[in-house]
């Protein structure tokens, strides 16, 4: 290979790698070893991850549906993906932190629903933050709810950006913001959960700032 061309290729590669660092961000597409799943039947193809489950399975797991976690820690950053659900059931974006060496809830976004397990509301989006209670293993839960509905059977581009005490949630052309001091805590893993039915996801990216 011509030496000048070789040097140009190396220089271009170094530029592509260096630019994100100069801008203070690292873009990560989670690998298989950074991904885990609880419950549900998984199939993958053409860049789409499909997780299927039934109401019977949901009830057998103490009313918990399938969840996929991405183990990419960050303090400031963005979790983004596109998703599609075949039922009018809530889809939950989950962020976990660590307390005393154990995973602990940090932040949740309930799309088409609320944290209440028996709720059938599908015209709201709910944001849940958690505050530690001194001397207790339990946490104080704060819920903020707004009117919103994501259409069934359609792809929805979604992202959650955490920066200091601010969470910015974008779903298609809608943007929501939540402030809470607890959001300053480090995320050890984030993911997506649904009750039952088929949830498809693609284009999962985590950007660390």
Language-model features and meaning:
Residues 11-20:
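Bacterial N-terminal signal peptides
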Residues 24-43:
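Extracellular carbohydrate-recognition regions
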């Amino acid at each position: 290979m011509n030496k000048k061309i070789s040097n140009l290729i190396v220089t271009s590669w170094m530029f592509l790698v260096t630019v994100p660092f100069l801008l203070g961000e690292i873009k990560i597409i989670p690998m298989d070893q950074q991904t885990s799943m609880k419950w549900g039947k998984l199939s993958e193809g053409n860049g789409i991850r499909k997780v299927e489950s039934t109401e019977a399975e949901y009830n057998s797991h103490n009313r918990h549906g399938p969840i996929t976690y991405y183990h990419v820690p960050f303090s400031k950053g963005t979790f983004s993906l596109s998703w599609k659900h075949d039922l009018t059931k809530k889809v939950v974006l989950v962020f976990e932190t660590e307390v005393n060496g154990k995973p602990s809830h940090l932040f949740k976004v309930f799309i088409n629903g609320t944290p209440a397990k028996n709720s059938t509301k599908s015209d709201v989006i709910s944001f849940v933050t958690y505050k530690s209670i001194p001397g207790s293993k339990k946490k104080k839960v704060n819920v903020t709810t707004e009117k919103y509905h994501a259409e069934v059977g359609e792809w929805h581009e979604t992202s959650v950006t955490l920066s200091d005490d601010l969470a910015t949630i974008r779903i298609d052309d809608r943007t929501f913001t939540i402030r809470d001091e607890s959001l300053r805590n480090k995320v050890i893993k984030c993911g997506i959960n649904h009750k039952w039915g088929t949830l498809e996801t693609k284009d999962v990216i985590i950007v660390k700032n």
